[in-house]
């Protein structure tokens, strides 16, 4: 394929940079639990603003509605990764939500979960990345449009909400270095035993 024949949108500088950052975010989520809570939050604090920036500068696209895109992240995969992050964050996972539409119908403060927000972002980004790897430029462009649309209407708000909570943890008076209690350890071991097979092979050729 010559340089002139490449799709000018899906191979543009902004798209390639977004793909790179999205891949780094997904790697962070997939390896949650392999490092300390503070280290995970420190990396999350840095990559979320970068991810927001990279998707915000993408060119607006048109949708090819007749294209049905495959979903790669199953409910089992989602629950496994969300549980891993919840175990890692422990008592720091929950935070008070201030941008939930349901607040207008509730007299009580609504709570949200960092791990759930990150898992929601991951699900859209991983589906996008896996579709993008097909090399079909029309499908790649549609996947990019879907990812942008979901960002505008859903996971972009989840991103900024979770970033607010992470910022509070990083700079608040919290003992993020405390060891996990026995219950969290037991849950972590159980989650590890149920690790989906696709995680072992998903990026086995990455770096080759």
Model regions and ranges:
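Long, low-complexity or tandemly repetitive, helically biased scaffold regions used
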Residues: 32, 53-107
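N-terminal functional modules and adjacent low-complexity/disordered segments of proteins
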Residues: 1, 90, 194-198
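Charged, amphipathic alpha-helical oligomerization/scaffolding segments
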Residues: 13, 17-24, 43-50, 54, ...
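N-terminal interaction modules that seed assembly of large macromolecular complexes
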Residues: 2-4, 9-74
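Internal, hydrophobic cores of structured domains that mediate oligomerization or house catalytic pockets
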Residues: 2-8, 94-137
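Acidic, proline/glycine-rich low-complexity IDRs
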Residues: 109, 124-208
